[in-house]
Amino acid sequence: MQTTIRIIGIDPGLRRTGWGIIETLGNSLRFVASGTVTSDGEMDLASRLCQLHDGLAEVVHGYQPHEAAVEQTFVNKDATATLKLGQARGIAMLVPARAGLRVAEYAPNAVKKAVIGVGHGEKQQIHMMLKVLMPKAEFKGNDAADALAIAICHAHNRQAVTSRLAALAG
């Protein structure tokens, strides 16, 4: 018997951290919710990280996901910006981990490949495929859309692992 798994995808960022929640049952995907947690750019770094933590903790507590997926960050030329993004990503991993969830990580190219079929694509392609895969999906902005794509990537990857385990067992 299959059970419904609720997944939260998180697209970390210091200004805006996107989140998207889906449910998966077998091959089917269902949109649950999406949004963005923001931090006040006028505040110090520690306070901004607290804002992200508290906002994500509220989402995790409210929607009770079973698993989490976070996008891996890329290193850019601005070392300070990369470090700050890494700290926001730490919050994005800490919140679900503290709630007892398994946290998976996916490279941006893996997320795009899972949703649009290729590792390099435009935001508009991702938005379009989200609507194809989940017609009831609602998202405001790229961060929430990216978070939904991360959740879908995890759903596809966990399904592949489950299928391989079933084949080995049977």
UniProtKB/Swiss-Prot annotation:
Give the top-rank taxon of the lineage listed in the UniProt record for this protein.
Answer: Bacteria
Homology family? Belongs to the RuvC family.
- The main place the protein resides is cytoplasm
Annotated residues for binding of Mg(2+) 1: D11, D143
- Tell me the cofactors it needs: Mg(2+)
Q: Which organism is it from?
A: Sinorhizobium fredii (strain NBRC 101917 / NGR234)
Transmembrane ranges? none
Q: Does the keyword DNA-binding apply?
A: yes
Q: How does it assemble?
A: Homodimer which binds Holliday junction (HJ) DNA. The HJ becomes 2-fold symmetrical on binding to RuvC with unstacked arms; it has a different conformation from HJ DNA in complex with RuvA. In the full resolvosome a probable DNA-RuvA(4)-RuvB(12)-RuvC(2) complex forms which resolves the HJ.
In this protein, the active site sits at D11, E71, D143
Q: How is the cofactor bound?
A: Binds 2 Mg(2+) ion per subunit.
Kindly provide the name given to this protein in its UniProt entry.
Crossover junction endodeoxyribonuclease RuvC
Top enzyme class: hydrolase
